[in-house]
Amino acid sequence: MEVFYNSKFVTNNVFLNPSETQSKPEVKYSFENNKLYTLLMHDPDSVYGNRFHWIVTNIINDVKNGEDVLLYTGPAPPPKTGTHRYIFELYEQIKHNDVKIEERNISMNFVKKILNIREPISKFRFISRNESGGRRTKRSRTKGKRTNRNRSKRVGNRPTIQKRY
């Protein structure tokens, strides 16, 4: 499978900024004549669980000939959620599908079941993160450890907390 954003070839597992991926990509594959295919694009790292960005079914010979079950939406990872994987998966269909999907945050197993698809015949992925930071917030290394700042003083058998003003 080959993926092109803005007419540029994209290498598998490459990092792309969300701004580079807002337009619908062109997907190419060596399709067998008169067979039906389904293309899924999803983000398994979404804050709300698996999120679908694009679903195309009933593809014959070219993705452009397929039916958009779920229209394309470009990646938009929220700030401080780290790196997200965006995965394209191509499946061979058993029969013609007349399914409409409106929800984007749904499980992969549910989608596979309603589309009657099994295992992908081709996969592609890229990674992305929010352009305004993108790193998860670092946790304090001293969390739970006793340091000079949070050490308590013992009076008898009971600790009393040293207050900072």
PLM regions and their residue ranges:
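N-terminus-centered regions that define maturation/targeting leaders and the start
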Residues: 1-141, 147
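Arg/Lys-rich, low-complexity, intrinsically disordered basic segments
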Residues: 134-165
